[in-house]
């Protein structure tokens, strides 16, 4: 029997592109997909469980992990910090799970840097960006939410354009013009990277 180590699936895409819906569909189809549990310095919300939803850390604990180089990537979001632990990802990869990291471009660049220094991350990391067919489509989707003011819509579009300008950081683009088609393409892509020879453990035919 062929045994496989997992892939680290880095997925990014601007707000309104349908990324969360596509990832949810893929997880329903592919049982070996998992999210890693991130660290955060924010307080737990009602019903959240430490170690399941997040690892809840004090700012001092978080900074200690930064100094000890324990994060694959980390960032500040408003007044709080979030990060992905190397140990959390590697343990899942070693038992054969494909680990999804839903992060922004800056986080993806940090993973690229980590891969340059770590052969296991370099082997495992696959970078996918979910993109709209064009900016006009994205603007229409964001406006259709009826949750944006003209000013906030303008800011979101500027942020999206900046994010999309970094598309060459990624290995693959999935264009979400039609949700059903994009969902099938993402699932096909995830199945394909699962079949890479670099995921095979040892010499199964020896």
Q: In which residue ranges do the predicted regions lie?
A:
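ATP-dependent NMP and nucleoside kinases share a basic, alpha-helical "lid"
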Residues: 63, 67-70, 84-146, 190
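Short aromatic/basic micro-patch
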Residues: 55-57, 83, 102, 173
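N-terminal phosphate/diphosphate-binding loop that engages ATP/GTP or pyrophosphate donors
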Residues: 21-70
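Extreme N-terminal, non-catalytic leader segments
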Residues: 1-8
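Flexible beta-alpha connector loops of hexameric P-loop NTPases
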Residues: 72-79, 145-151
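Short glycine-/polar-rich loops that comprise or flank the Walker A/P-loop
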Residues: 6, 31, 121-126, 168-170
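NTP-dependent small-molecule kinase module
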Residues: 2, 140, 147-148, 162-206
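Conserved glycine(s) of the Walker
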Residues: 13, 18
């Amino acid at each position: 029997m062929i045994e496989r180590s997992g892939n680290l699936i880095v997925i990014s895409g601007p707000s309104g592109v349908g990324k969360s819906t596509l990832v949810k569909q893929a997880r329903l189809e592919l049982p070996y997909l998992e999210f890693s549990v991130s660290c955060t310095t924010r307080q737990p919300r009602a019903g959240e469980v430490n170690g399941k939803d997040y690892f809840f850390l004090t700012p001092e604990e978080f900074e200690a992990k930064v100094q000890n180089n324990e994060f694959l990537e980390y960032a500040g979001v408003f007044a709080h910090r979030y990060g992905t632990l190397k140990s959390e990802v590697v343990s899942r990869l070693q038992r054969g799970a494909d680990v999804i990291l839903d992060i922004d471009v800056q986080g993806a660049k940090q993973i690229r840097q980590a891969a340059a220094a770590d052969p296991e991350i370099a082997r495992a990391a696959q970078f996918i960006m979910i993109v709209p067919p064009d900016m006009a489509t994205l603007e229409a989707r964001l406006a259709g939410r009826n949750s944006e003011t003209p000013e906030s819509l303008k800011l979101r579009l500027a942020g999206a354009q900046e994010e999309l300008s970094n598309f060459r950081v990624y290995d693959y683009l999935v264009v979400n013009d039609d949700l059903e088609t994009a969902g099938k393409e993402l699932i096909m892509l995830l199945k394909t990277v699962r079949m890479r020879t670099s995921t095979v453990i040892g010499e199964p035919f020896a």
